[in-house]
Amino acid sequence: MLQQVMTNPGEITFREVPVPEVKDDQVLVKIRNIGICGSDIHVYHGKHPFTKYPVTQGHEVSGEIAEIGKNVSGFQIGQKVTIEPQVYCGHCYPCRHGKYNLCEELKVMGFQTTGTASEYFAVDASKVTPIPEDMSYEEGAMIEPLAVAVHGVKQMGDVKGMNITVIGAGPIGNLVAQTAKGMGAAKVMITDVSDLRLEKAQECGIDVCVNTLHKDFGEAMVEAFGPDKADVIYDCAGNNITMGQAIKYARKGSVIVLVAVFAGMAEVDLAVANDHELDIKSTMMYRHDDYVDGIRLVNEGKVHLKPLISKTFAFKDYLKAYQYIDDNRETTMKVIINVQED
């Protein structure tokens, strides 16, 4: 079978390797689609601090069951699935308490261990989640980033009836906003400096879409929600400007959730955060229930994934996909690799 390998930053080759043998507790997945995310792009540019080369990428993935290990039940040949890419120890304090996303030895497929970018991939059945038969493989490859959004939204607890602001309308911010609405938020405002991203958010049903190049962030919140502003602000951009906005304009005693991976060392006014008794939370990846909830939200028509797909590339055009992203950064949301297309 064919397997992708990033040998060095900006260099991708393909090699012929045997189809992996399936162990008793594993399934063999015929890989269909793979999404490219911001962390993959960091690897492509040699800027991911926890990835060494060569590496086979692929952690946002969909496929179908091709073979089932003898100890595995609950799956059928040909069944559509996605894969949870975390590899965890199961023994550390977080793992023992069900928070394996915080494992002390956490590895992620496509970064610290072999990813799914191959025609077939053998994986523990415990990491495989079925997706509905009427869900496309492209959408299936986006369940992973949706799970990130679901887990992030849940850091606030029950958001039903709340007023919510999301900073950053890229794929994760868009999905956070959609998830919050899908979970019952009363009103959701999203901000960005890209009209295209805001148009996508509007297409996905977000209530208020604001370009903060043209409108003051604080004024926009008051216009959207009144003087009480938002109950929670989700920072899905992750830089000093956006976190500064969140801290400055958050209602006193409210919550800020940092969803984005912060860009470098933070320089923010913690004196204001302290004086306003702001509750600043963070979020890390997801757990199985976030996958299940994300799939349910899509199935119920509360989250829309297709509008976020900008372009699809054949497997052998993996490098061209990265080049396309670099050349069209301002107009690209999500690029998908079709592994079964030559």
Task: Give residue ranges: language-model regions.
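C-terminal hydrophobic helical "lid"/dimerization subdomain
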Residues: 3, 244-248, 288-342
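N-terminal glycine-rich cofactor-binding segment
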Residues: 3-21, 38-67, 82-83, 100-114
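Glycine-rich beta-strand-centered segment in the early N-terminal region that forms part
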Residues: 20-34, 47-93, 127, 132-134
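Conserved beta-strand positions in the Rossmann-like core of class I SAM-dependent methyltransferases
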Residues: 66, 188-189, 257
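NAD(P)H dinucleotide-binding glycine-rich loop of Rossmann-like/cofactor-binding domains
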Residues: 89-167
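Mid-domain Rossmann-like dinucleotide-binding core that forms the NAD(H)/NADP(H) cofactor-binding site
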Residues: 135-214
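Glycine-rich cofactor phosphate-binding loops and adjacent beta1-alpha1 units
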Residues: 156-160, 199-279, 319
